[in-house]
């Protein structure tokens, strides 16, 4: 089974047409990976689907990097 970071890297790679191995944990979706605002919404939706959870709108707006997404997911699972 893939770890959470790998799962997120695969989602980002698929959504943005980037090789997942080139998606680092600190990569900024917009600045470094070229995602526009629609891409970022689609990334959040894909992450929600993959991890079977809902990301609150306020939190979704604060997820700008792979690490932000990972921290949110792992933080939700600890609750």
Task: Specify the residue positions occupied by each region the protein language model found.
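Amphipathic alpha-helical interaction surfaces in cytosolic regulatory modules
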Residues: 34-44, 64-66
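Phosphopantetheine carrier-protein modules
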Residues: 15-34, 50-62
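Residues in well-ordered alpha-helical elements
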Residues: 6, 21, 41, 66-67
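Thiotemplate assembly-line natural product biosynthesis machinery
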Residues: 1-21, 74-79
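Generic structural marker for isolated residues within well-ordered, non-membrane alpha-helices
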Residues: 9, 26, 44
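C-terminal structural segments of small proteins and small subunits
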Residues: 61-62, 67-78
């Amino acid at each position: 089974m893939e770890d959470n970071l790998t799962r997120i890297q695969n989602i980002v790679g698929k959504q943005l047409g980037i090789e997942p191995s080139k998606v680092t944990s600190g990569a900024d979706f917009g600045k470094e990976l070229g995602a526009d605002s629609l891409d970022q919404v689609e990334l959040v939706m894909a992450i929600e689907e993959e991890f079977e959870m809902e990301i609150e709108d306020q939190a979704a707006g604060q997820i700008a990097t792979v690490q932000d997404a990972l921290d949110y997911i792992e933080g939700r699972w600890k609750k």
